[in-house]
């Protein structure tokens, strides 16, 4: 049990590298994810297609790779599963021992209602700003998973009575992955004497789900991503965005995944559906050569899994705030904060550093800190010519 549960987070780290807001951008990640108005033209396809054209004199650029992973275990589920694995082995060896009965029943009871989350992704982009129509071709992959047990009261009673039987309590992994291949196109228009950038992103999507269900004492990390647990589908989707800039002030609005899509998981004792629905985000930013301050507000909540079993609380509606301080174009210090209006996620502090010698090579790293059991990191490399 201990080895397999801990290894799950490692497995998702590698899975995310080929699986897909659904984006990783180390610069904006460090700024709390507030990229709707503050992202640069290389990452515009991830946040707001209008930003490709906001600075038409920018240089040709390449972003690759950008990669990140986040692990959130607010209820200490991983530790709880490890503890249960240890005491359950002792119980099986001597089910009549009263200490084994008490420790095992308590360990199983403590798993009830706990949940852990894992997410990660990778991406890359090529951007060509022009004075007419600017373009950003990008590929990004992202995956997220929920690990949750379903505990049976009858198992707890059987253990307390010293009955060594097969457990009916389950461990479940629900995972979703998406690969986006898109082309963000944007241009500038004059409206009431103001310059406004307008962008659109047609994109193809490859959608995946995994649904792995097994007895809580028989979880094996080598089995969760077997073909029989997988479903997949393909879809066309679209993002849109607008951005207004007056001196250092920016206001922007982005709509992502305007075409709703649902994909069902494999059927086990339950069946779930993952929902890809539109997300609208309003962003503002104050951008100068030495500092950037940004704020993003999701205008609607985002629901993910629904199903026939107990409700999975994974809907979010985020407020993000961030800042970047630039040392004359050579190094950057960043920080931010994320708050979930739906209270699904705990508040997240983000930090990051950037190095950009001669403003040609850009290397960015970020870290997110939620609590002692929840954290994340991302990194990226970019070239501007």
Q: Which residue stretches match the model-derived regions?
A:
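Gram-negative bacterial Sec-dependent N-terminal signal peptides
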Residues: 1-19
């Amino acid at each position: 049990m201990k080895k397999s549960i801990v290894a799950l987070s490692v497995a998702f780290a590698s899975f995310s590298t080929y699986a897909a807001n659904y984006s990783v951008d180390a610069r904006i990640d460090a700024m709390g994810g507030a990229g709707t108005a503050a992202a640069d033209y290389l990452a515009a396809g991830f946040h707001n297609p209008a930003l490709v054209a906001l600075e038409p004199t920018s240089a040709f650029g390449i972003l690759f790779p950008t990669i990140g992973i986040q692990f959130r275990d607010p209820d200490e589920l991983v530790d709880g599963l490890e503890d249960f694995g240890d005491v359950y082995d002792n119980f099986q060896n001597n089910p009549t021992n009263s200490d084994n009965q008490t420790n095992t029943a308590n360990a199983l009871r403590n798993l009830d209602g706990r949940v852990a989350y894992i997410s990660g992704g990778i991406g890359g982009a090529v951007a060509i700003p022009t004075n007419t129509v600017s373009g950003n071709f990008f590929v990004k992959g992202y995956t997220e998973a929920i690990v949750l047990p379903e505990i049976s009261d009858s198992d707890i009673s059987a253990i307390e009575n010293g009955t060594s039987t097969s457990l009916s309590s389950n461990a479940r992994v629900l995972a979703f992955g998406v690969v986006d291949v898109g082309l963000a196109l944007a241009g500038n228009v004059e409206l009431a004497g103001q310059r406004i950038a307008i962008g659109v992103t047609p994109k193809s999507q490859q959608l995946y789900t995994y649904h792995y269900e097994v007895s809580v004492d028989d979880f094996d990390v080598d089995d969760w991503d077997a073909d029989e647990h997988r479903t997949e589908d393909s879809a066309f989707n679209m993002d849109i965005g607008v951005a207004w800039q007056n001196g250092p002030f920016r206001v922007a609005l982005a709509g992502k995944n305007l075409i709703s899509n649902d994909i069902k998981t494999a059927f086990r004792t339950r069946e779930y559906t993952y929902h890809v629905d539109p997300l609208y985000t309003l962003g503002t930013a104050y951008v100068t050569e030495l500092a950037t301050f940004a704020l993003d507000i999701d205008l609607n909540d985002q629901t993910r899994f629904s199903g026939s079993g107990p409700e999975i609380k994974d809907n979010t509606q985020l407020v993000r705030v961030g800042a970047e301080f630039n040392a004359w174009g050579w190094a950057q210090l960043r920080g931010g904060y994320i708050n979930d209006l739906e209270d699904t996620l705990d508040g997240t502090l983000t930090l990051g550093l950037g190095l950009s010698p001669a403003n040609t090579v850009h290397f960015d790293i970020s870290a997110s800190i939620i609590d002692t059991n929840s954290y994340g990191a991302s990194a990226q490399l970019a070239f501007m010519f």
